[in-house]
């Protein structure tokens, strides 16, 4: 019933607003609710209905479809894309199976380890997978993590960031993807167990074990150590997919020493491609090589799927600059277009940019910073560049000249005829 105005002024039991502050106040047994709280409840229920409907109609893309979308964003790495597509498809099929209530066969979770040089596309692969599947995604740097109780970041903070990516929707977060970069940097310092505490190496591996395997973690919504009295969010990590990545510099030497396949003979022949040799060596990777590198057996056991990424050559880097949907050159061209200017990057300049990235050994990651540096002055004066064309040549990349700025001529009908007549006059 609606509370009469002549009675003692009452308040909403949910938002504490007084009767005169709202349009309606509905009474129940010893409680009251205002029209604003009713509308809020209806909005929440409507949103949950949309999520439920989306879950019902959602279909997992096939490995071929996943790989096809990856091809739109990631250049090369065909084997890695195939492995990831199959692994991710099987992971989310497993989730469907678990949610259906079937338990005749227990399907284990298969987390993934990506091994590849800096700038080879490990992070981009993980990000693109999350985008394809429309699931929450977060990244963490393993080098910033420490065991609980030490200065640094708790592993629970990774789960907090995933919750934030899911807008604190626990059910959604529990189906997300977590990418942990630079796991090679948390390798223990010695192959033999140490009597001293290794809080940023083996200690972090131990801390990651439980959440990677599957546990109900207590996640502090405000970040943990600074707010010890806060309520915790319970998050089940059993169905969260963990993808770990690292460069693992030097692991090729460990593989070579195990297989007694010395590269000295190869090095003597200058015609042999060293990168090709390294690719072949990495194909022989075994669990014992990762153990010798410094990962503990229990941690390796949580990462049953291991795949390697190749070094990117000049041709691949040029393709990355121009072909993908989010290609760097396309992005900069669009930025200039928004300011009514035009950007031209010559083919020879693209090759020079790729060569520069190879020389710096930054892979695809270094391409953007090179172009940012080349275009800094032009972008700084972009307001003056309306109806202007900025051209980047090979000499510009090499630092010999500044970017070439010319006018964009948009002739009228009359001037077009005059220009055509002039062009017809023989030189």
From Swiss-Prot:
Keywords: ATP-binding, Chaperone, Metal-binding, Nucleotide-binding, Zinc. SMART domains: AAA, ClpB_D2-small, zf-C4_ClpX. InterPro entries: AAA+_ATPase, ATP-dep_Clp_protease_ClpX, ATPase_AAA_core, Clp_ATPase_C, Clp_protease_ATP-bd_su_ClpX, ClpX_bact, P-loop_NTPase, Znf_CppX_C4. Zn(2+) binds at residues 12, 15, 34, 37. GO terms for molecular function: ATP binding; ATP hydrolysis activity; ATP-dependent protein folding chaperone; protein dimerization activity; unfolded protein binding; zinc ion binding. ATP binds at residues 117-124. Residues 1-53 form the ClpX-type ZB domain. GO terms for cellular component: HslUV protease complex. One of its GO terms (biological process) is cell division. ATP-dependent specificity component of the Clp protease. It directs the protease to specific substrates. Can perform chaperone functions in the absence of ClpP. Component of the ClpX-ClpP complex. Forms a hexameric ring that, in the presence of ATP, binds to fourteen ClpP subunits assembled into a disk-like structure with a central cavity, resembling the structure of eukaryotic proteasomes. Belongs to the ClpX chaperone family. PANTHER family: ATP-DEPENDENT CLP PROTEASE ATP-BINDING SUBUNIT CLPX-LIKE, MITOCHONDRIAL (PTHR48102:SF7), ATP-DEPENDENT CLP PROTEASE ATP-BINDING SUBUNIT CLPX-LIKE, MITOCHONDRIAL-RELATED (PTHR48102). This is ATP-dependent Clp protease ATP-binding subunit ClpX.
């Amino acid at each position: 019933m609606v509370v009469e105005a002549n009675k003692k002024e009452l308040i909403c039991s949910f938002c504490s607003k007084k009767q005169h502050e709202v349009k309606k106040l509905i009474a129940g047994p010893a409680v009251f609710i205002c029209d604003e709280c009713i509308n809020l409840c209806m909005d929440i229920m409507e949103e949950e209905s949309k999520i439920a409907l989306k879950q019902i109609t959602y279909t997992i893309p096939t490995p071929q479809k996943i790989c096809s979308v990856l091809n739109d964003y990631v250049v090369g790495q065909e084997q890695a894309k195939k492995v990831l597509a199959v692994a991710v498809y099987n992971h989310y099929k497993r989730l469907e199976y678990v949610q259906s209530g079937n338990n005749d066969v227990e399907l284990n979770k298969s987390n993934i380890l990506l091994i590849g040089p800096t700038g080879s596309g490990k992070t981009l692969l993980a990000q693109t997978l999350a985008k394809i599947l429309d699931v929450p995604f977060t990244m963490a740097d393993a080098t910033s993590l420490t065991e609980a109780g030490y200065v640094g970041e708790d592993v629970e903070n990774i789960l907090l960031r995933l919750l934030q990516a899911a807008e604190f929707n626990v059910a959604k977060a529990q189906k997300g993807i977590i990418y942990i970069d630079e796991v090679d940097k948390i390798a223990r310092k010695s192959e033999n167990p140490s009597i001293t505490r290794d809080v940023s190496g083996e200690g972090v591996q131990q801390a990651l074990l439980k959440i990677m395997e599957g546990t109900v973690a207590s996640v502090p919504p405000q970040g943990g150590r600074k707010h010890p009295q806060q309520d915790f969010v319970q998050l089940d990590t059993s169905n969260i997919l963990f993808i770990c990545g690292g460069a693992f510099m030097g692991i090729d030497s460990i593989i070579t020493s195990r297989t007694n396949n010395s590269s000295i003979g190869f090095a003597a022949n200058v015609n042999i491609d060293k990168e090709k040799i390294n690719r072949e060596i990495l194909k022989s990777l075994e669990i014992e090589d990762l153990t010798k590198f410094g990962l503990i057996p229990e941690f390796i056991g949580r990462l049953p799927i291991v795949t390697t990424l190749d070094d990117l050559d000049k041709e691949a880097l040029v393709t990355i600059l121009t072909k993908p949907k989010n290609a760097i050159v396309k992005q900069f061209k669009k930025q200039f277009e928004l300011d009514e200017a035009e950007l031209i990057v010559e083919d020879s300049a693209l090759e020079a940019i790729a060569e520069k990235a190879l020389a710096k050994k930054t892979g695809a990651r270094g391409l953007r910073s090179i172009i940012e540096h080349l275009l800094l002055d032009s972008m700084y004066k972009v307001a003056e560049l309306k109806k202007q064309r900025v051209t980047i040549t090979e000499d510009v990349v090499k630092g010999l000249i500044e970017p070439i700025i010319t006018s964009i001529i948009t002739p009228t009908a009359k001037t077009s005829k005059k220009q055509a007549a002039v062009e017809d006059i023989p030189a």
